[in-house]
């Protein structure tokens, strides 16, 4: 079994074996909110299950980590593909999964998405998050000092 691809998206779901994406395929997000912030993302993963691996349950795991190795999210599960009637002998099967994950983003950074099958790394992707223009401006402006009240004599 191998990972064919990992896609980041604003929204993703798999229905009847078909992947539906909205805002998919990005590798960079701009956040216009103060950090730390909560960000909902979706991840779609495609696994290719070889003919000789069908009808065997395999453990899988998806991890999202920052560049310091701090884990932001983890999904555990199992993958098992059967052999549909009429399939050509030897043909691999595709299993697609999609996950919606709320991430707590502490600061602008790069993040890694790692897919594991049976505790072995099978695929990897990465994405970055930066502060939007509004957030950069707020950090650069000095804090305004309160004016002293004027007393009329």
For the regions a protein language model found, what residue spans apply to each?
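Contiguous segments within soluble domain cores/interaction surfaces
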Residues: 2-105, 110-117, 121-153
């Amino acid at each position: 079994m191998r990972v064919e691809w990992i896609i980041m998206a604003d929204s993703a779901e798999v229905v009847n074996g078909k992947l539906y994406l909205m805002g998919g395929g990005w590798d960079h997000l701009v956040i216009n909110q103060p950090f730390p912030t909560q960000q909902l993302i979706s991840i779609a993963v495609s696994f290719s299950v070889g003919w000789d691996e069908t009808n065997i349950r395999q453990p899988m795991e998806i991890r999202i980590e920052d560049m310091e190795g701090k884990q932001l999210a983890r999904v555990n599960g199992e993958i098992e593909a059967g052999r549909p009637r009429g399939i050509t002998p030897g043909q691999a099967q595709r299993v697609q999964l999609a996950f919606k994950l709320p991430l707590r983003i502490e600061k602008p950074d790069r993040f890694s998405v790692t897919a594991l099958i049976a505790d072995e790394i099978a695929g990897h992707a990465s994405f970055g998050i930066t502060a939007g223009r509004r957030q950069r401006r707020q950090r650069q402006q000095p804090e305004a000092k309160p004016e002293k009240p004027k007393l009329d004599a």
